[in-house]
Structures are given as C-alpha cells and as structure tokens.
C-alpha cells in the first residue's frame, strides 16, 4: 500500500512541470476536501506501547477545510485544517487506536495547462496533534497525546468550472506525526483527496469596450529584378531600347504602388568575369543609368538612389564552375548580371466602418 501511495505522488509530481486555473490576483478563496488517508510505518516501539497481534486498519477516511489568498496566477498562500483519520488496531491480546489532526500553512505554486486547468504543488508545514491508546488484555492501558510540527508536501490538478467554483484532485504527504517516546509510534501520512473551493470576488461588471484605435500604417517593401542582358549590352552601361521599354513597364508598377514617404534603391550586379574593381564600377554605372531613366520618367531624384554591388551575391552559385569556354561561361552567368529594385514606403490601412 505504501508503494501505491508513493507511485501516486510521483505521478502527480511528474505533472508539475506545468500548472493554473487560478483565481484573480489579490483575492481570497475557501473550500473543503474529502478523501482516502493512509498511515505508513505504524509499528509501536516506544513508551511501553506494544504492537498489535491482529489487524491494523491503516487506511481511513480523511477530510479537511482550507482557505487561501491568491497573490498572482502562479502563487497563493493557503492555510487549513486536516483530519488525518483514526487508525484502529484490533487483536485478542493488544488493541487500541492512533489518530491525528493538524493545522497547516503552505505556499501553493501553480502553472496553467489550459485556460481552466492548472497543475500545482504545495509546500509548507503542519502543526499536528496525535493521540494514541494501547490496551493489553489483562495488563496496562495507556493513553497519551503529543504535538509537533512536520513538513507538508502536496501536488495536484485544479479545474475551474466557473470563475468562482473550482475542484481539485490532490495527494498530500506528511512526515513523522507523533513521537514514539510519547505516543509509542511516529508514522507518516499520505492522503488522496477531492476538494471543492469557492473564489471570492471573481464576478465583475463587463468592462466598457473602448473604440478600436485606427490601424497603424503598414510598412511595405516590394522587390523587382530585371535581367541586365535585357537592359544593357555585355560590358556596357548604356540602356538598350528594349531596356527602356522594360523600365517603362516598371515605372507604371511603381506609380501604382503610390506609398507615402517612399524610397527606391536600385542595386546593380555583375557576373564574376573581370576584376573586382571593374565589376564594382560597371555595376554602379548600370544602377545609375536605371536611376537616371526613372527620374526622367517622373520619380523624384531625392527618393531614388543607386548602389553598385559588383559581383557579390551571385545567384548561380557553383553551377558554372566547370564551364571553360568564355562564350558559354558568359551565357551561364547571365542570371548574375541583373538589376534589383527595392521600394519601401508606408501605406495607410483603410478599414470599413461597421454596419
């Protein structure tokens, strides 16, 4: 039976990685519980008490009442009273009973699994009173009591049916209740219980809903990529007629975007053929040619800039590494020769009024 109780405690502790159907912050709650209470290590060995020669009923009904203060969703302080049960032992030579009760104070640590379901653990202490009777047929009759303090460990799950009503399933463990020098034994107690609690101050008037603020303007970014072979002849930075046609179409798209506070960046790229310095200069010249043309179409000169990137950021990767002939290599590297245009701006979000 002791192994069963420990297994339940371990299972509940395993859940305790997450926990919370907690009341509102800074509110009070109260409740009661009822369950199965079992004493462990119940042998008598002190103060003249004798062990039973018959059945010992270690499992009994346990009950309690509790109240607490919820500090925040994860922490509460809880106090309560527990009746841990009366354990009778019956034999034809020795009989009697052991019972205990106590007042406890614990910190309750919770964590939410779902909106209405928490896992929690309670840690603290109990001030207990233990009473024992021991009757030996034809011999001594003893009756003593003892008081003391023991640690309390508990874990469980709690579900909120409504904001004000919650239930909990809990396993609680208390070490060393009693003193063998007084009541003849010093058992431990484990109690598996079901509890119900009422949370005070959970209901409130529905808040007045303020009008939703106007949506924040959206920052938009658009990217366009044009092949340099369409815009320019190889190794040249002067726009071809078909390149101008391509930029005319691009200008129409840019005009349709119409962002506020817009800015356009034109990035020129080359392939890897040639020196770094030459490719950097050529990419800058090509980007500037595109900028000049778009400015001539109507884009404000202060809103558009040219940046030469040289042979950086090739899109072909290593696909052309084994191409040896120059003409074939030029064709293979064509995707690297490109002009990218990036448009950034703020666009107001228009919302429809509610019906």
Curated annotation (Swiss-Prot):
> Its topology with respect to the membrane?
Multi-pass membrane protein
MF terms (GO), sorted A to Z: porin activity
Q: Which domain of life is it from?
A: Bacteria
SUPFAM superfamilies to which the protein is assigned, alphabetical: OMPA-like, OmpA-like
Subcellular location field: Cell outer membrane
Q: Which residues form the signal peptide?
A: 1-21
Coiled-coil portions: none
Which family does the record assign? Answer: Belongs to the outer membrane OOP (TC 1.B.6) superfamily. OmpA family.
What is this protein for, i.e. what is its function? With TolR probably plays a role in maintaining the position of the peptidoglycan cell wall in the periplasm. Acts as a porin with low permeability that allows slow penetration of small solutes; an internal gate slows down solute passage.
- Mind telling me what this protein is named? Outer membrane protein A
- Which species does this protein come from? Shimwellia blattae (strain ATCC 29907 / DSM 4481 / JCM 1650 / NBRC 105725 / CDC 9005-74) (Escherichia blattae)
Organism phylogeny: Bacteria, Pseudomonadati, Pseudomonadota, Gammaproteobacteria, Enterobacterales
Primary gene name: ompA
